[in-house]
């Protein structure tokens, strides 16, 4: 028997062993999967409108090469979110711990399509020469200076991925309210339970179990149309010292509109320039064309996303002075 054949046979034996160790129902799920979420837990503890701690544990078994992406770790951070703790463990098909993964091994990337942003990413690419193998990650994220939304419960992250069990728990102090919305959960083994803690806390718990893999089909529905998830959002919130209410679209729109207050003022020299450009125009269309042509020559799109700047536009005065702004900054400037 050749070395290649022995290696291939060993891989098949390991896969069979892995399946034999799984419960019957889990075997059914795994048989059509490239990766299997063995256990995923998320706990969100909100301490106030501006602070929270998110603790996550994810154990996933990679059944073949096509499921390898599920073995990697990613954590997005910014000036509001920071990774506090992390640990990982790689386990082979026999259930033996191969190695521990430390936080110092994570790669930090600040790569972005924006000119400047406070977003950054921690990631770890997990690779192992034989399948199946299991990887377990445990991490904690601290949120400060604002909470405009909470993590989404999404038990399945990719096509051909089964789920043995997944859970999500969020707790808010008395007086705060969290709303939720389910999507694509009908007919699936996903439950949402709401309760009140001993000190008046609002507690929401979501559980999912034995979710079969979703198979990608040519010209089939998109990821967003198929995958189950539960969204969570506060009613009243505070974000970068700006308080708002998103219990209704009307109230959230009023908060968004308040971010524009005082940011659409133009300098007197620029106002004079606009009058000069449109002085000889006889129709509104000619005026619009004159202003548009001038702004097209004197402004450029540049993405700068810092803090609440991801939602609040740069002032019209600064766009006039520098000649650049992002989409909302230029739109605000062009309201003239």
Model regions: which residues?
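Secretory-pathway-linked proteins and extracytosolic
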Residues: 142-152, 158-160, 167-308
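Bacterial Sec-dependent N-terminal signal peptides
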Residues: 1-28
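Generic beta-strand/beta-sheet core signal
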Residues: 91-93, 209, 330
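Lumenal/extracellular ectodomains and adaptor appendage modules
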Residues: 27-167, 268
């Amino acid at each position: 028997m050749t070395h290649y054949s022995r290696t291939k046979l060993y891989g098949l034996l390991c896969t069979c062993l892995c399946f034999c160790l799984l419960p019957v129902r889990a075997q059914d799920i795994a048989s059509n999967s490239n990766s299997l979420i063995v256990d995923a837990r998320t706990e969100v503890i909100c301490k106030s409108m501006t602070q929270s701690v998110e603790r996550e544990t994810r154990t996933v078994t990679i059944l073949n090469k096509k499921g390898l992406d599920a073995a990697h770790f990613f954590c997005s951070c910014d000036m509001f979110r920071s990774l506090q703790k992390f640990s990982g463990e790689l386990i082979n098909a026999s259930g033996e711990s191969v190695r521990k993964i430390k936080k110092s091994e994570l790669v930090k990337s600040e790569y972005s399509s924006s000119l400047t942003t406070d977003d950054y990413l921690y990631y770890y690419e997990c690779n192992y020469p034989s399948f199946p193998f299991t990887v377990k990650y445990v991490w904690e994220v601290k949120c400060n200076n604002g909470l405009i939304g909470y993590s989404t419960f999404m038990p399945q992250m990719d096509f051909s991925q089964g789920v043995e069990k997944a859970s999500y728990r969020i707790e808010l102090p008395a007086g705060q309210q969290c709303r939720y919305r389910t999507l694509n959960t009908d007919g699936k083994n996903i439950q949402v339970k709401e309760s009140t803690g001993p000190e008046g806390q609002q507690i929401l718990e979501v559980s999912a179990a034995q979710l079969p893999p979703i198979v990608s089909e040519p010209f089939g529905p998109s990821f967003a149309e198929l995958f189950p998830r539960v969204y969570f959002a506060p009613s009243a919130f505070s974000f970068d010292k700006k308080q708002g209410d998103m219990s209704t679209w009307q109230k959230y729109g009023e908060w968004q509109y308040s971010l524009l207050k005082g940011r659409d003022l133009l300098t007197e020299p620029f106002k004079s320039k606009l009058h000069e450009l449109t002085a000889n125009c006889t129709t509104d269309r000619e005026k619009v064309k004159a202003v548009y042509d001038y702004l097209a020559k004197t402004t450029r799109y540049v993405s700068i996303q810092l803090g609440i700047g991801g939602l609040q536009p740069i002032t019209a005065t600064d766009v006039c002075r520098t000649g650049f702004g992002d989409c909302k900054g230029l739109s605000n400037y062009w309201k003239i």
